[in-house]
């Protein structure tokens, strides 16, 4: 993270500071939740990817068997 300095003569009230702090906490919570959801989606999608690859392999094998079939039913 980059550090920066803001110079200003604006004075914030305690209420303004509290509201800003609350908003920062909410944003941190949202970012954390989104990161956790993204991680969970990645974890959840891996087995699905494996199933798709396995099914594709099975389809290719069936297509080869059908091509070799001499009975003419396929």
UniProtKB/Swiss-Prot annotation:
Name of the protein this chain belongs to: Uncharacterized protein 118R
